[in-house]
């Protein structure tokens, strides 16, 4: 924890009753909360959205907000304010979300509907160029020949922020487990900026605010490079970050050495959380002050994991980056 932003006392209210879901601190950290929709809420939600296939949500973007309202109404309109409060709270900003009864790949469409409803209670998910939709589904297998670490199973996918190589602001990231077979390892890795021991050192460095070039590989379907600094500040002057080691392109020796040292200290941070995410559950994090990655898998010839992601912006009038927008 650093001197810039200490954790404030804003833990889950003990004894707080919610309608349609429960909320508890996770076993890994009080910053990460576990939200579970009851079986009744899950069943009623799926019944009320059954008339709209996933394709309808893809074609008619307003339906994504409609299913969000249905879910919030089933939770006595307590869900939306709770989601926003948690994700915007610097001391927390992360949720592990589960719906009782949704836990099998045969329910993949239901998973997409649920995740879409939750995401569109806090904002709107951006267009994902990799998939051509507002969400992306992708598979990790035992052998991979892709052009990034996203699908490579036998190595750690280093901690990073999403949205570094696009111009849209990426306030939140949602990562859902759709299927898993013959899997050992591969936990999600999370690091809150304020738990990174070397934040002050790198945030105060002269290179922290220098715009750098970010370029994505062909699989991302993004051909335009973007330029922005690794660090910025929020409206209260606290550090936020837009960083990924694979796609930042240092222009010279000074930038390359600084980025390499930054990467080393992030990857060795003792503040990193290892979070198992079972099938049907998803992580929802504030992308400005949480970094995420993935631990390595144990090799198996029939290893398979399918994931779904959404990333987008909070539905607020103000930007959450203070300077470089």
Swiss-Prot record:
Fe cation binds at residues 160, 162, 292. Gene3D superfamilies: Clavaminate synthase-like. InterPro entries: GlaH, TauD-like_sf. Acts as an alpha-ketoglutarate-dependent dioxygenase catalyzing hydroxylation of glutarate (GA) to L-2-hydroxyglutarate (L2HG). Functions in a L-lysine degradation pathway that proceeds via cadaverine, glutarate and L-2-hydroxyglutarate. Homotetramer. One of its GO terms (biological process) is L-lysine catabolic process. NCBIfam families: PRK02963.1. It catalyses: glutarate + 2-oxoglutarate + O2 = (S)-2-hydroxyglutarate + succinate + CO2. CDD domains: CAS_like. Coiled coil: none annotated. Keywords: Dioxygenase, Iron, Metal-binding, Oxidoreductase. The gene is glaH. Binds 1 Fe(2+) ion per subunit. It is an enzyme of class 1 (oxidoreductase). It comes from Escherichia coli O81 (strain ED1a). GO terms for molecular function: ferrous iron binding; glutarate dioxygenase activity; oxidoreductase activity, acting on paired donors, with incorporation or reduction of molecular oxygen, with 2-oxoglutarate as one donor, and the other dehydrogenated. Signal peptide: none annotated. Its EC number is 1.14.11.64. Its cofactor is Fe(2+). Belongs to the glutarate hydroxylase family. This is Glutarate 2-hydroxylase. Pathway: Amino-acid degradation. Pfam families: CsiD (PF08943). Disulfide bonds: none annotated.
